Amino acid sequence: MIKYLTALATCFLLAPFMLVAQIPQYYSNVDFNLAGDGLKVELSSLLLDTHTNLIPYTSSNTDTWDVLRISDLVEANSSNVLLIYGYDDSDSSTNNDRTRDIYSNQSSNCIGYWNREHVFAKSLANPSLVTNQPGPGTDVHNLRAADCQMNSSRNNRLFVSGSGNSGISGSYFYPGDEFKGDVARIIMYMYLRYPSQCEPLNIGVGSSSYSTNGDMPNVFLDWNEEDPVSDFERNRNDVIYSYQGNRNPFIDNPYLAFKIWNGPVPLDSWGVLSSSDLLTQTVSVFPTITNDYLYIKGTNPSQRSVKIFNQLGQVLEFELNGDKIDVSGLPKGLYIMNIKVSSQSKLFKFLVY
């Protein structure tokens, strides 16, 4: 976010020109003055309209294997692919390897080989993703090279928050610190590209209180901010774009996730969207620790809506009188307030003691 008022004013005045100059041509027909569902619908339509080439899963012609051998290279001119969820090439185990030769691949579960991981697990889509014909199940944006055994360990486990290397956590799976942002941005892409088939609530564990409609688990929005886009992801996005015709917008700019679903504020890769969101920067709530009242500053009471969530994501009842909120009836604990003005939202955390 830009912090100085003079800079903010300048950016606000120049925003229409900056948007044209710095946002990639691929997004030229998207209205980035929109937020929330409006922006989500426009991006969803773009991904559908530009997905002009459906890649077969396995074929004597160009198939998903061929694309992954290029898109998932560790780096240019490398002979190894990067294995999602992997973290150690130096020990005697192969299931946790981070890289592997591009031709050490098999379609079946084989020790020491890599195969194709569906990040949005096939069985968690509704209907399930299939690979016997080109379509949602063969969308390469959702496929990653993975060690066969690691792929089997992940299986169709839902993703859950964690830390450190990847691994099973109870009945869930943590993708690892290196890959959690990758996973989040793939899940977001799949939701926009196949909105009724690949709903994030079916694959992520925990509250979805950040998003106004409760349709995006907080864990993915957290990961999108905590694990920034890597050069590997950017190159992969370019390669898949050259084959399929469409892009993953959350790799191009992770800030788009914030504009649609709120949550933590990630980097604005284009440097123009965050500076245009001046409305959300003018709203404030105080105090953040209280046992009686909160006050809202910077909005007209008749033009806003206010919701308060507990840590389970449940919407709570409260008394609102103009800019004054009575929270004295809430139990002690941490809460999230969502203030929405027009199509923009802003979240605030506060503690009741």
Predicted feature descriptions by range:
Residues V315-L330:
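Glycine-centered tight-turn motifs at strand-turn-strand junctions
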Residues P287-Y295:
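Short coil/turn motif common to extracellular beta-sandwich-like domains
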Residues M1-Q25, S275, L347:
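Bacterial Sec-dependent N-terminal signal peptides
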Residues P264-F286, T299, R304:
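Residue-level detector of functionally pivotal "anchor" positions at catalytic/ligand-binding pockets or at interdomain
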